[in-house]
């Protein structure tokens, strides 16, 4: 594959996937997921990574993540790449700074650059995302008007972040002076903690309120965190009342996020919410054709059809297979049906299977030395209730199963019972280190079995 075919986003997703499979969930969420790959220097084989703060930077140094990055990079690209990690911050309240430079505050907020590859031009519209795309385009052209807030929800790997950042890129194209801020929910919470420690909460609030467009990824991470929910509620109200735009992504609808304050649920739903579903075959084929045009290589329709037929999970895996295919071209091997089939066979061996509810129930039951019948039955004694709630929590965090369906899997319990159980575990792991470690170990064990 020629260097011009290199897809940084797919490359980084492949590395993140290997980190996720080989470390604890909490460590991954704290130290790997918040990092963004923004630039590749193919001549020197380096990749520029953005970290949201110094704490993440220190974790990379202490955790030997650089060496792991290089190992996983070779797995993904069959070549050596070295990461260059930088902390990206922006001085608070950019509007005031441009005018008079009045603020001498030490407060800085996370400010990621928008991914320039995430545009409407590189987005493929299909039945699975048509409504969400229509709303996103409308918001990019007239922010703060009809759809405010706009919530885009759906399972991981379907393109929520791409569509959300496309809104930001389009608005900057139409209004170059517009202030657009993209953050993850974890970034927001980290910034708030830093502001409190530095006694700069007023600057924190000003920084987040003085925007034309606020893009917030993974809003479900607010679950069970009342203190952060209150602050986000206040900022949310200020932005929407000023007729500025908020766009959010989530795995599920707000009403299905356990531990989310009713006021926030109401506010989040005052605009519109559209889901992105798994792409159908025509959309998957169109995505592959779009990618081949993007990297400038010709792949016959039969080969693309084979890939589109066999990978029906999500866009991320589809692009991963395509990227592997183009890597073969870099090695001088032909891109054809035969080689595509070999790639798919390899992916079928290495790709994780779907985690099922029975898998989780059995793993938890074995770990706590209780029977499956007791775990899903009516017993309410403490030695049964805790593992039952742990199982519910793991199902909620490791799968896309809705609360009602989880309730059905536990003897037909009501969804509010499931919500209470998952909220209780989320609260407990904030203070009970032993339980937190046990759940992380269970999560790792479940993923390894799947």
UniProtKB/Swiss-Prot annotation:
Pfam families: Bac_DnaA, Bac_DnaA_C, DnaA_N. Residues 330-450 are annotated as: Domain IV, binds dsDNA. Residues 79-112 are annotated as: Domain II. InterPro entries: AAA+_ATPase, Chromosome_initiator_DnaA, Chromosome_initiator_DnaA-like, Chromosome_initiator_DnaA_CS, DnaA_C, DnaA_dom, DnaA_N_dom, DnaA_N_sf. It is found in: Cytoplasm. SUPFAM superfamilies: P-loop containing nucleoside triphosphate hydrolases, TrpR-like. PROSITE patterns: DNAA. GO terms for biological process: DNA replication initiation; regulation of DNA replication. Its main location: cytoplasm. One of its GO terms (molecular function) is DNA replication origin binding. Residues 113-329 are annotated as: Domain III, AAA+ region. Keywords: ATP-binding, Cytoplasm, DNA replication, DNA-binding, Lipid-binding, Nucleotide-binding. The gene is dnaA. Residues 1-79 are annotated as: Domain I, interacts with DnaA modulators. HAMAP family: DnaA_bact (MF_00377). Belongs to the DnaA family. Oligomerizes as a right-handed, spiral filament on DNA at oriC. Plays an essential role in the initiation and regulation of chromosomal replication. ATP-DnaA binds to the origin of replication (oriC) to initiate formation of the DNA replication initiation complex once per cell cycle. Binds the DnaA box (a 9 base pair repeat at the origin) and separates the double-stranded (ds)DNA. Forms a right-handed helical filament on oriC DNA; dsDNA binds to the exterior of the filament while single-stranded (ss)DNA is stabiized in the filament's interior. One of its GO terms (cellular component) is cytoplasm. ATP binds at residues 157, 159-161. Domain I is involved in oligomerization and binding regulators, domain II is flexibile and of varying length in different bacteria, domain III forms the AAA+ region, while domain IV binds dsDNA. It comes from Oenococcus oeni (strain ATCC BAA-331 / PSU-1). This is Chromosomal replication initiator protein DnaA.
């Amino acid at each position: 594959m020629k260097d011009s075919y290199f897809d940084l986003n797919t490359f980084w997703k492949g590395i993140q996937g290997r980190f996720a499979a080989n470390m604890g969930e909490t460590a991954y969420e704290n130290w790997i997921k918040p990092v963004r790959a923004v630039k590749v220097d193919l001549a020197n084989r380096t990749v520029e990574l953005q970290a949201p703060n110094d704490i993440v930077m220190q974790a990379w140094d202490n955790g030997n993540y650089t060496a792991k990055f290089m190992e996983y990079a070779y797995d993904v690209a069959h070549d050596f790449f070295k990461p260059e990690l930088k902390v990206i911050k922006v001085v608070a309240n950019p509007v005031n700074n441009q005018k008079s430079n009045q603020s001498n505050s030490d407060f800085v907020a996370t400010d990621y650059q928008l991914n320039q590859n995430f545009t409407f031009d590189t987005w493929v519209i299909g039945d699975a995302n048509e409504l969400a795309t229509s709303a996103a385009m409308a918001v990019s052209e007239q922010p703060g008007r009809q759809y405010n807030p706009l919530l885009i929800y759906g399972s991981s790997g379907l393109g929520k972040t791409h569509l959300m950042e496309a809104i930001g890129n389009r608005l900057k194209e139409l209004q170059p002076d517009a202030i657009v801020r993209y953050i993850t929910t974890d970034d927001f919470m980290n910034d708030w903690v830093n502001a409190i420690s530095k006694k700069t909460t007023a600057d924190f609030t000003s920084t987040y309120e003085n925007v034309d467009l606020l893009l917030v990824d993974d809003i479900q991470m607010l679950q069970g965190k009342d203190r952060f929910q209150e602050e986000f509620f206040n900022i949310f109200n200020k932005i929407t009342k000023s007729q500025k735009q908020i766009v959010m992504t989530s795995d599920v609808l707000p009403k299905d996020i356990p531990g989310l304050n009713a006021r926030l649920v109401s506010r989040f739903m005052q605009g519109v919410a559209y889901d992105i579903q798994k792409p159908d075959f025509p959309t998957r084929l169109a995505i592959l054709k779009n990618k081949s045009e993007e990297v400038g290589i010709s792949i016959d329709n039969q080969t693309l059809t084979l890939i589109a037929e066999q990978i029906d999970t999500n866009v991320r895996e589809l692009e991963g297979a395509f990227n592997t295919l183009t890597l073969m071209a870099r090695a001088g091997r032909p891109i054809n049906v035969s080689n595509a089939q070999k790639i798919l066979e390899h992916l079928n061996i290495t790709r994780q299977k779907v985690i099922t509810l029975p898998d989780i129930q059995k793993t938890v039951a074995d770990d706590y030395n209780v029977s499956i019948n007791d775990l899903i039955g009516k017993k309410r004694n403490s030695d049964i209730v805790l593992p039952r709630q742990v199982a519910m929590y793991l199902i909620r965090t490791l799968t896309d199963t809705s609360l009602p369906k989880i309730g059905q899997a536990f003897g037909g319990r009501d969804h509010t019972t499931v919500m209470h159980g998952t909220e209780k575990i989320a609260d407990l792991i904030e203070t009970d280190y032993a339980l937190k470690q046990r759940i992380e170990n269970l999560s790792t064990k479940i993923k390894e079995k799947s």
